Amino acid sequence: IGLYIAADPHTFDMVELAEQTPFAGSSLAGGLVLAAILIGLAVKTPTVPFHTWLPPAHTDAPAIGSAVLAGVLLKMGTYGFVRIAMPMLPEAWRDWAWVIIVVGIVSVVYGALVALAQTNVKRMVAYTSVNHMGYIVLAVGAAGLIADDTTQARSIAVTGAVTQMVSHGLITGALFLLAGVLQDRAATYDMDSYGGLAGPAPRFAAFFAVGAFASLGLPGLSGFIAEFQIFTGSIAAAPVTAIALVGILLTAALFLRALQRKQLRET
């Protein structure tokens, strides 16, 4: 509504709003409008501290519902950052860039740490969504810091964010469907209830391993391509974003642990 009122002529057309940048030169009003937009998009994405609805939603939803939620619905939040907030409020976005970067870093590390502590495979994958959405927020925040003379780094960061949206949707959607297979066959998501699945269910084990390796960013898979672009662009803008590299190590640890508990450990 704020963008509509400030636009001249009044419009909800996103292309026209991006061309007008209605709050150019008004840092206070632009900052308030951006803050409202960011809170709404942060809930939808979700990022820390607005993430608490996501794990219960995934845990209680059927596998297909979780796949659609992760693959499509969460992307409406991150799409909003790239399509609405950044182009329509560029000055305010630059002013808020460090806040956005910090939220992204916290989401990356926190999501991975909490996922590492889970025994429920579906909740584990749900918390990795917080982790992976954090990478996107980190990238778009870093893009706000990059000056016009480093447009290549800015482009790489934003391209990495968009690639991560697609990659996360495919990978995490697949992992939720595979978790649904476990629930369908054994009526539980508890990883400790399984063991040695690689023997009796080799195809399931192979599919889950591919999904896990893609999610942790193994080179050659889409997760690596997205994260490489994100960090290439982000670290050029703000070296502090390298802290988020810890999230990659934690994600590798949690998925390797899950593979060992479900597929290799003898019961």
Where are these regions (language model features)?
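C-terminal ends of transmembrane helices
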Residues: 45-59, 109-128, 180-183, 259
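Cytoplasmic/organellar membrane-interface segments at the starts of transmembrane helices
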Residues: 61, 192, 198-204, 255-267
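Hydrophobic/aromatic positions within or immediately flanking transmembrane alpha-helices
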Residues: 37, 68, 101, 125-126, ...
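Alpha-helical transmembrane segments and their helix-entry boundary regions
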Residues: 63, 67-68, 124-125, 157-161
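Predominantly late transmembrane helices and immediately cytosolic-facing juxtamembrane segments
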Residues: 48, 172-178, 241-267
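Small-residue-rich segments of transmembrane alpha-helices in multi-pass membrane proteins
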Residues: 1-2, 63-79, 129-142, 201-211
